[in-house]
UniProtKB/Swiss-Prot annotation:
Family listed: Belongs to the NadD family.
Organism field: Citrobacter koseri (strain ATCC BAA-895 / CDC 4225-83 / SGSC4696)
Name the record gives this protein: Probable nicotinate-nucleotide adenylyltransferase
Gene: nadD
Signal peptide: none
HAMAP family: NaMN_adenylyltr
CDD domains found in the cross-reference section: NMNAT
Disulphide bond pairs: none
EC number from the UniProt entry: 2.7.7.18
Length: 213
């Protein structure tokens, strides 16, 4: 049996401990063999990143240089068109084969808006969903039909994530770090310290490049 892998996507503008530490804890809790970090290029539903694709990629390389759990995947950065999760996960499934257990990591806030994502119905055909719980967010979907969808796929044991290739939703108890890329950009713009929010190597690069000023 192949070991469970997970994909973790985002803008990472910039990458920080709020991205890395919960996922490291998650990997230990449920037994992830590796986590593929995938920065996106043109998020269809979000403002454009302040740092360039090359700069965001390099900051990620610095952040995970001493973390063998993580592997960087550049495929979305190389696209000239908008990045859609459903398309990426379909490609990943085709590469890994039909039987490999695969998961996609999202935050609880993203779960609540998940039914608005492009082709969201197809995502569980290709992967599991691992949801990192966040304080202040409800555990129920807005619409009853979406709540029924959640309950139909919900599992309370990570064993299912290893035993099945796709199709389950697992709510994980991960630590919450009150850090956001927006907060970091605001602090950097004001000249406030960010030493405790991100790896030193990333902060040094930001300062060298004069980013987020």
């Amino acid at each position: 049996m192949k070991s469970l892998q997970a994909l973790f996507g985002g803008t990472f503008d910039p990458v920080h401990y709020g991205h890395l530490k919960p996922v490291e804890t998650l990997a230990n809790l449920i037994g992830l063999s590796r986590v593929i970090i995938m920065p996106n290029n043109v998020p269809p539903h979000r403002p454009q990143p302040e740092a360039s694709s090359a700069q965001r990629k390099y900051m990620l390389e610095l952040a995970i240089a001493d973390k063998p759990l993580f592997i960087l995947d550049e495929r979305e950065l190389k696209r000239d068109t908008a990045s859609y999760t459903a398309q990426t996960l379909k490609e990943w499934r085709e590469e890994q084969g039909p039987d490999a257990p695969l998961a996609f990591i999202i935050g609880q806030d993203s779960l609540l808006t998940f039914p608005t994502w492009h082709d969201y119905e197809t995502i569980l055909d290709n992967t599991h969903l691992i949801v990192c719980r966040r304080p202040g967010y409800p555990l129920e979907m807005v619409k009853e039909q979406h709540q029924q969808w959640l309950e139909r796929h919900l599992t309370h044991t990570p064993d299912d994530l290893h035993a099945l290739p796709a199709g389950k939703i697992y709510l994980a108890e991960t630590p919450w770090f009150n850090i956001s890329a927006t907060l970091i950009r605001e602090r950097l713009e004001k000249g406030e310290p960010c030493d405790d929010l991100m790896p030193e190597s990333v902060l040094n690069y930001i300062n060298q490049q004069g980013l987020y000023r």
